[in-house]
Amino acid sequence: MLKKVRGARKKATLNQTRQETIYLAIEALQKDTSISVQLLCEIAGIARSSYYKWLNRKPSTREMENEQLTQVMMTIYEKVEHTFGYRQLTLHMRKQTGKTINHKRVERLMKVMGIQSVIRRKKKKYTNATPQQVTENLLNRKFNADAPNEKWLTDVTEFKYGNGQKAYLSAILDLHDKSIVAYVLGRSNNNPLVFQTLKRALQAAPGSSPMLHSDRGYQYTSLGFKKLLDDNNIIQSMSRVGRCIDNGPMESFWGTLKCEKYYLHTYHTFEELESDIEAYIHFYNNERLQAKLNGLSPMEFRTKAA
């Protein structure tokens, strides 16, 4: 008997939630379009009198909270160009309001507002050139570090601009806080691009001797790169052949960058692309919150660890 009562209560709550969602959707559509309330109610399969009864009621505390949260949510959503899903929105809403907000509540509000995050595209696979030298996968997917500048990941990714012209972004990511330590955008995917990235990282973190993990791209297997690592007492680690998951957090960053910025725009010049990448990496390091960093941005997490 007790189970039946609980089941009935749960069913009633679900029905109320569905009705509330329908009413909110009608209200939003009626404000944003020229469609009449009568037609919207007919489409939704509800009585117009029921909708007006709901509309003229006194809003509950929960409803007023939802309205405030929706405003906060939409402000964040617009700022990031419609790229955040419910997890990222929840983190930013918690920080902005100082309230404990359940991610399921944010997901429901997103459905009411008819919004969703962008979908990541699959990464193209490329065949690497014959390596001059290789090393073992010393990192072995241990994607954690006790302090900054202990373990770095690096990789190069491709962008297009103008009339099919290509640009290449080389970056180094710190596994401690997932921050981008250094990056270089160039027109050629060559050794100087990768060498300059490492030099910038060493300038940003003088005296550091981290483990540096990469795939087996020809730049990383070159003798010149190996010498640069040895000169700075850096231990080299490489992914196994065809195992991009061995460099997972780096691949994840590329996906985030492209979904939240690159795929949303058309770039006519190298300078336009460069400006947006620079702005996004600054946003990622300083403002974009991560659940695995206790709801902090990479630089906030790094500062607390200092």
Predicted regions, residues:
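Residue-centric detector for conserved, function-critical "anchor" positions
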Residues: 1-36, 63-68, 301
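Basic, flexible linker segments flanking DNA-binding modules
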Residues: 14-20, 41, 49-147, 243, ...
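Structured, non-catalytic alpha/beta "coupling" segments that mediate domain-domain communication
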Residues: 27-54
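Mobile genetic element proteins and their domesticated derivatives, centered on retroelements
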Residues: 40-41, 51, 73, 89, ...
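RNase H-like two-metal-ion nuclease catalytic core shared by retroviral integrases
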Residues: 128-130, 214-216, 222-225, 236-258, ...
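An active-site-proximal beta-strand-loop segment
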Residues: 145-181, 187-188
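Active-site beta-loop-alpha junctions of metal-dependent nucleic acid enzymes
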Residues: 165, 184-205
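C-terminal domain-tail junction helix/linker
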Residues: 230-234, 256-306
